[in-house]
Amino acid sequence: MSQKTPSPPGELKRDIRALKGASKVARIPVKVEPTTERQRKPHWIRAKAPIGPEVLRLKGLLREHRLHTVCEEASCPNLGECFGHGTATFLIMGNICTRRCPFCDVAHGRPDPLDAEEPMHLAQAIGAMGLRHVVVTSVDRDDLRDGGAAHFTHCIQAIRTQSPQTRIEVLVPDFRGRMDRALEALTAGPPDIFNHNLETVPRLYKAVRPGADYLWSLRLLARFKEDHPTVPTKSGLMLGLGEELAEVEQVMKDLRDHGCDMLTLGQYLQPSLYHLPVRRFVTPEEFDGLGDKAREMGFTHVASGPMVRSSYHADRQAAGESVV
C-alpha cells in the first residue's frame, strides 16, 4: 500500500489554526473572556526573534523527518534562542491535543492515528543533530488505551539504538484514567529523566487545567519514582495566573513529599488574546527567592526565572547549571 503523502506545511498550518484560539477554549468549564489588546511586558521579559540560518536549518530538518516541536506548536517565546543553538523539544503523537487547556496554544481536536514510523524518524533527526540531551513530549491522547505511553517507549528505544550516548528526558501528560497501563508500558524503556508538569496551584486547576487533577498528577510522579527510584523526576509551574506565593511554596512541598527531584518555575505568557490573561508579572527577585526556597527543600536541580520553561536549556538544567 502506498504511503499517504504528508500535507504541505502551509496546508497543515491552515488546518491547525482553525483548532486553536477562540474555537479551542469555547467549551471549557470556566469561560475565558478574550482580552482586547496585548499586555505590555516588563523589561525583564525578552525573547529572541525566531530568525536566522540555524533556525531555518532546524525547521527544514524537522519537516524532512515529518516531526513536530512543542516550541512551534505551543508558540514558545524561547523558540528563536533554542533553535538558534540547535536544540528543540520534540512533540510526538501529532500536533492535535484531546484537551482544551486555556493556557496552551497547541490545537485541540480529534488526533490522527499514531505514525508507526515516528520513532524511527525521531531517532534519525536526533542522530543528525548530534544532540547529547533530548526532550520528548506529547499532546494528550485520551483516545488511546494507554494514553500513548507505549509510543513514548518505542521512541525512547529507537533513540537509544541510534544515539546510545544521548540523555533522554520525557515530559509526559497525566495519562488520566490510564496510570497503571501507562506505567507498565514505560517499564520496557524508562527515560533518563521523567517530567510531568503540575502547571499551577490546586486552587486554579478548574480554570487552568480543565480535565486534570492535582492529586492524580502528584501520584503519577510518585508512582513512577517507586518503579524507577534511580531515575530523577521533574515538574514545573507557570506563575502569574493568580496564585499566591504561599500556594506555590505549598506545591513545592507537595512535590518533595512525592519524591520529585527537579523543579522549574517560569512566567506564564498569554499565547493569544483568547487565552487566559496574565494576572501579574512575577519579578526576577521573586523567582530568585522561590528558587532559594526550593533548594532548601531539597530539590537537586532548580531553574527559576521569568523565561524558564520546563525544557528550556534542559541539558544545562540536568547538569545543575544556573538557568534563568
Curated annotation (Swiss-Prot):
Which positions fall inside the Radical SAM core domain?
83-300
What domain of life does the UniProt record list for this protein's source? Bacteria
Residue sites binding [4Fe-4S] cluster 1 per the record? 71, 76, 82, 311
Residues of the signal peptide: none
Please name the gene that encodes this protein: lipA
Name used for this protein in its record = Lipoyl synthase
Q: Which family does it belong to?
A: Belongs to the radical SAM superfamily. Lipoyl synthase family.
Q: What keywords does the record list, in alphabetical order?
A: 4Fe-4S, Cytoplasm, Iron, Iron-sulfur, Metal-binding, S-adenosyl-L-methionine, Transferase
Tell me its EC number(s), please. 2.8.1.8
Primary localization class, coarse? cytoplasm
